[in-house]
């Protein structure tokens, strides 16, 4: 199973409550913050919900 790096690139201001909760669940609070997660269907689903606010990179 791979890993992905998720970086917050846009603000959560004026976003829906669900999008804010997803960002919090991913561990993203500040713009430019990067977290590493396992490449699981749960994480990929959360990333898909906020794909316009984050950038994603695959890591080894």
Swiss-Prot record:
Fetch the HAMAP family from UniProt: Ribosomal_uL30_B (MF_01371_B)
GO cellular-component terms in the record? cytosolic large ribosomal subunit
**Ranges in coiled-coil conformation:** none
Q: How does it assemble?
A: Part of the 50S ribosomal subunit.
The record's section on NCBIfam families has: rpmD_bact
List the molecular function annotations (GO) for this entry. Answer: structural constituent of ribosome
Arranged from A to Z, the UniProt key words for this protein are: Ribonucleoprotein, Ribosomal protein
Is Ribosomal protein among this UniProt entry's keywords? yes
Source organism per entry reads: Christiangramia forsetii (strain DSM 17595 / CGMCC 1.15422 / KT0803)
According to UniProt, the name of this protein is Large ribosomal subunit protein uL30
Family under the similarity heading: Belongs to the universal ribosomal protein uL30 family.
Q: Which Gene Ontology BP terms does the record give?
A: translation
Q: Quick check: keyword Ligase in the entry?
A: no
Please name the gene that encodes this protein. Answer: rpmD
